[in-house]
């Protein structure tokens, strides 16, 4: 089978930095134990399991504050998705050692919200309900940040926004086409709105790569966790922009061979939080796949989870 490897794909710098910081915490004997990660360090269950295997506990809850309240001692790692000021304050009050792995691009949005709300703005924030990145952003100024994901929610915004200064910004991993459409609708309702599109560069170039490169293939496989918003958006872009059917899989074991019937050329990409070795297993399998040769249908290649984490240099005493 012909395989088209969409480029760029896979890890972004924010994910790599977050994983390195968490791995360095594990390797640092001076940090108080136990080590907890407040939510998934990045949205990939294989990465989470790799850290669990090293004795690092991933703690989750309905929100970050609820999860934090279950931690009484040790070290807490804040994930790449960013954290609200109140959660940070509470971690300090509990006497926890903090390792902050927040993505710099996310922190830029936090700074923007902090600056604009201090100047008297309300903020319309385009993001996904229930995702930790909007939770952290809203927490910067909870009385002045309004989360929307869908167009109908624009009509439900407070009436005071017609008379106030308004900023619209967004979660960094949204579909750039969805964000643009929502911004256009917001501008029609609030002509005085100030726009700051914060789709991060890594998200943008990966979406554009799919839009431009997947169109001449019969199928796109996106390798990414179901909780990874940027991975799910890549499949959406393939269907809606490139016109190519797409499926998202967490790893090779989730690939349904029925999808490959009648397909001669398949494209492969991966989300920003997907480990490269996991994507490589999918590409290698598809490259040797022959529908008429059962010996090429084995989808259970061994992968050492420890190998998906970035290496850290030994710490000197």
From Swiss-Prot:
Give the cofactor binding note: Binds 1 [4Fe-4S] cluster per subunit.
Similarity field: Belongs to the IspH family.
> Which of the seven top EC classes does this enzyme belong to?
oxidoreductase
Lineage, uppermost ranks? Bacteria, Bacillati, Bacillota, Bacilli, Bacillales
Provide a Gene Ontology MF annotation, just one: 4-hydroxy-3-methylbut-2-enyl diphosphate reductase activity
Q: In which pathway does it act?
A: Isoprenoid biosynthesis; dimethylallyl diphosphate biosynthesis; dimethylallyl diphosphate from (2E)-4-hydroxy-3-methylbutenyl diphosphate: step 1/1; Isoprenoid biosynthesis; isopentenyl diphosphate biosynthesis via DXP pathway; isopentenyl diphosphate from 1-deoxy-D-xylulose 5-phosphate: step 6/6
Give me the residues that bind [4Fe-4S] cluster, please.
Answer: 12, 103, 200
The record's section on Gene3D superfamilies has: 3.40.50.11270, 4-hydroxy-3-methylbut-2-enyl diphosphate reductase, catalytic domain (3.40.1010.20)
Q: What is this protein called?
A: 4-hydroxy-3-methylbut-2-enyl diphosphate reductase
Documented EC number(s)? 1.17.7.4
What organism is recorded for this protein? Exiguobacterium sp. (strain ATCC BAA-1283 / AT1b)
Record's keyword annotation contains Metal-binding:
yes
Q: Does the keyword Metal-binding feature in the UniProt annotation? A: yes
| UniProt entry keywords in alphabetical sequence | 4Fe-4S, Iron, Iron-sulfur, Isoprene biosynthesis, Metal-binding, Oxidoreductase
Residues at the active site: 133
Cofactor(s) needed for function: [4Fe-4S] cluster
